[in-house]
Amino acid sequence: MTQKIAVLPGDGIGPEIVEQAVRVLQALNLPLELQEAKVGGAAFDAFEHPLPPATLGLAKSSHAVLFGAVGDWKYDSLPREFRPEQAILGLRRALGLFANLRPAILYPELASASSLKPEIVAGLDIIIIRELTGDIYFGTPRGVRSAPDGVFSGEREGYDTMRYAESEVRRIAHVGFETARKRNKKLCSVDKANVLETSQFWRDIVIEVAREYPDVELSHMYVDNAAMQLVRNPRQFDVIVTGNLFGDILSDEAAMLTGSIGMLPSASLNASGQGLYEPSHGSAPDIAGQGIANPLATILSAAMLLRYSLNQPAQADRIEAAVRKVLAQGLRTADIHEAGTTKVSTSQMGDAVLKALA
């Protein structure tokens, strides 16, 4: 059966890095139908909207979406609803993407590029699972008003609402436990249950779900301690599951442990396994068109696409092994280049991965 992939390169370095990931997917000779469409600023320029109906329709009808990056300074003056970044939010809503998976893997060859000492991060291989659709980012009511009470009653105040429904917590908890079950059977749930009612509710539900996974070791950690432990002893973790706000912060922190955000893929999944796959980095308009962007995060995102949405784990393993081989050969794009290694361009890195696949 042919499986359809929506290819959305986007802005900045997006087209350059997605091109290399597409080359890798095509080299596998799988029955894939790759259809490309505009998104973000590129879509606004062409259709006056960052997520045109045709692009959204393609994404909905596909088994998975391979996404590049969106955003450019030239769009900063647009009304918020027309800015490129709204495209990714719109896709998350329309596809019901609620689980964000962010691996943080330190390849041995890049240990010296990490922010931490090699002996602390050597062998790091963790995954952070972030809930995407709830929490303070989407809770209502929110806004600016005259404070109705408190010490500063009558002054202007900004306010947001942190909230989670039971079903939202249950489904992300299941993703966490299922992921842990396939790895080392350790799951750490991160919250702020000592202060927030929402977090205590989160913890209670996670504990209930844990009864269905007696083979998985569950632990809990307050988010402030988790942020510290990721720097102090990151290898104590295997799978972390947490809410939208905490996950947003912790996943970026974990990214810096690996040496370069240009190496980190991500997946966002819905209940049926349909997913959006993208590198964790942004559109980097300052280096767009120079041929120096690192395509490995996007290529690894394509591997996640094969693993989680197309049920092709063996092909995903092939891509990941090819990336490891290329790094072992000493090939580096500018962001991870250091003395004693060979600097290559975006397309040359793609060529090397293709050769390693053969």
UniProtKB/Swiss-Prot annotation:
The protein's required cofactor(s) are namely: Mg(2+); Mn(2+)
Residues carrying the site annotation Important for catalysis = 137, 192
Ligand binding (substrate):
92, 102, 130, 224
Q: Which Gene3D superfamilies match?
A: Isopropylmalate Dehydrogenase
* Reaction it catalyzes: (2R,3S)-3-isopropylmalate + NAD(+) = 4-methyl-2-oxopentanoate + CO2 + NADH
Enzyme Commission number(s): 1.1.1.85
Q: Which domain of life is it from?
A: Bacteria
Pathway(s) this gene product operates in, as recorded in its UniProt entry: Amino-acid biosynthesis; L-leucine biosynthesis; L-leucine from 3-methyl-2-oxobutanoate: step 3/4
Going by the UniProt record, its keywords in alphabetical order are: Amino-acid biosynthesis, Branched-chain amino acid biosynthesis, Cytoplasm, Leucine biosynthesis, Magnesium, Manganese, Metal-binding, NAD, Oxidoreductase
Keyword Signal assigned to the entry: answer is no
Where is this protein primarily located?
Answer: cytoplasm
Give the record's cofactor note, including how many are bound.
Binds 1 Mg(2+) or Mn(2+) ion per subunit.
Q: Which residues participate in NAD(+) binding?
A: 282-294
Localization per record? Cytoplasm
Any idea which positions bind Mg(2+)?
224, 248, 252
Give a Pfam family name: Iso_dh
Subunit info here reads:
Homodimer.
According to its UniProt entry, the function of this protein is described as: Catalyzes the oxidation of 3-carboxy-2-hydroxy-4-methylpentanoate (3-isopropylmalate) to 3-carboxy-4-methyl-2-oxopentanoate. The product decarboxylates to 4-methyl-2 oxopentanoate.
Q: What is this protein called?
A: 3-isopropylmalate dehydrogenase
Q: From which organism does this entry originate?
A: Bordetella avium (strain 197N)
